[in-house]
Amino acid sequence: MTAYDVVIEIPKGSRNKYEVDHETGRVYLDRVLFTAFVYPADYGFFENTLGDDGDPLDVLVLLEYPVFPGVGIKVRPVGVLKMSDEAGGDAKIIAVQHKDPRWQHIQDVNDIPEYTRKEIEHFFARYKDLEPGKFVTIEGWGDAAEAEKIVQAGFANLEAQGH
């Protein structure tokens, strides 16, 4: 499986929603989540991609310990949580650190413990509940092959934009 570069914006356990300004590279506090939820894993984006929402593809990285905003990690996709929000399609690729022996047994979304998948799905289903005009629709899980196709499409989308 191919390894990809991602940048973490939000560490596991945070309510702060950080975003990287892609022109300056600076990390900004976008908002504090309106709900009492915390991110269930480190959250960021795939470099050099463009998702359906016009932003780089989102990624949730399962790690032993959280990292801090701005850290780059080589990951391999193992699945995808298919969802949409008020801006359109908003798939969340689920990945693990490439070559970390603690995660080698996770090759596909079904290798992730069921309870962990439920936590991730519950977080994304409810984390915007108190924000006016925002919503999320969960559409289900996809396997590693589907996640890989979405990542490849993200690279192609950015290239088609002339970048």
Curated annotation (Swiss-Prot):
GO terms for biological process: phosphate-containing compound metabolic process. Its cofactor is Mg(2+). Mg(2+) 1 binds at D53, D58, D90. It catalyses: diphosphate + H2O = 2 phosphate + H(+). Pfam families: Pyrophosphatase. It is found in: Cytoplasm. Mg(2+) 3 binds at D85, D90. One of its GO terms (cellular component) is cytoplasm. GO terms for molecular function: inorganic diphosphate phosphatase activity; magnesium ion binding. It comes from the Bacteria. Mg(2+) 2 binds at E9, D58. Keywords: Cytoplasm, Hydrolase, Magnesium, Metal-binding. InterPro entries: Pyrophosphatase (IPR008162), Pyrophosphatase_sf (IPR036649). Substrate binds at K17, R31, Y43, Y127. Its EC number is 3.6.1.1. It is an enzyme of class 3 (hydrolase). The active site is at D90. Belongs to the PPase family. Homohexamer. PANTHER family: INORGANIC PYROPHOSPHATASE (PTHR10286). Catalyzes the hydrolysis of inorganic pyrophosphate (PPi) forming two phosphate ions. HAMAP family: Inorganic_PPase (MF_00209). This is Inorganic pyrophosphatase. It comes from Leifsonia xyli subsp. xyli (strain CTCB07). The gene is ppa.
